[in-house]
């Protein structure tokens, strides 16, 4: 039987990030076109979760919240985890979100933020040599991401579709 009273549930808001050691859970809700990036160091039983909104900060002259952007938030999350004892060589990632929440009649790539977020997150993870183990991205439904730092598992609750483990 699992001792639930010792497990904390840490919330991550939109354009935010947080970390937790085992056996705690990190949860983010409201993943539409946004993407949740769960990074886990299995040797140190440490997890981090980032909820990004936009792919690239370079399009903006002033950045007030770096956690909004894939290109800034992911490296910040990794540095924060390293500061807590994690090693980037042990890190692996899982991602969810990146939905096309609006049905544009003009299928202009620039309007599909969800798809662009997915491309950017994968690019940043690759540049940082963090393997992407699994993903649940795309579609047109919102998601909740529940990251279990006990074993690195991630449950995705999709609107109208139940829960899926990635």
Swiss-Prot record:
InterPro entries registered for this protein in UniProt: CheD-like_sf, Chemorcpt_Glu_NH3ase_CheD, Cytotoxic_necrot_fac-like_cat
Keywords: Chemotaxis, Hydrolase
CDD domains: CheD
EC number annotated for this UniProt entry: 3.5.1.44
Pfam assignment, any one: CheD
GO biological process entries: chemotaxis
SUPFAM superfamilies per record: CNF1/YfiH-like putative cysteine hydrolases
Reaction(s) catalysed by this chain's protein: L-glutaminyl-[protein] + H2O = L-glutamyl-[protein] + NH4(+)
Gene Ontology MF: a single term: protein-glutamine glutaminase activity
Function: Probably deamidates glutamine residues to glutamate on methyl-accepting chemotaxis receptors (MCPs), playing an important role in chemotaxis.
HAMAP family, alphabetized: CheD
Family as reported in the entry's similarity comment: Belongs to the CheD family.
Protein name: Probable chemoreceptor glutamine deamidase CheD
Origin species: Clostridium acetobutylicum (strain ATCC 824 / DSM 792 / JCM 1419 / IAM 19013 / LMG 5710 / NBRC 13948 / NRRL B-527 / VKM B-1787 / 2291 / W)
Gene: cheD
């Amino acid at each position: 039987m699992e001792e639930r009273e010792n497990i904390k549930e840490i919330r991550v808001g939109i354009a935010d990030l947080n970390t937790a050691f085992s056996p705690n859970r990190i949860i983010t809700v409201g993943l539409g076109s946004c993407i949740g990036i769960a990074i886990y160091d299995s040797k140190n039983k440490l997890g981090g979760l980032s909820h990004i909104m936009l792919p690239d900060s370079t399009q903006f002259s002033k950045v007030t919240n770096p956690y909004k952007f894939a290109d800034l938030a992911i490296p910040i999350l990794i540095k924060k985890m390293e500061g807590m004892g994690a090693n980037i060589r042990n890190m692996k990632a899982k991602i969810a979100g990146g939905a096309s929440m609006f049905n544009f009649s003009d299928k202009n790539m620039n309007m599909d933020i969800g798809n662009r977020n997915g491309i950017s997150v994968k690019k940043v993870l690759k540049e940082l040599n963090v393997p992407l183990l699994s993903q649940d991205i795309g579609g047109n439904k919102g998601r909740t991401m529940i990251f279990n730092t006990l074993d690195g598992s991630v449950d995705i609750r999709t609107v109208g579709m139940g829960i899926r483990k990635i």
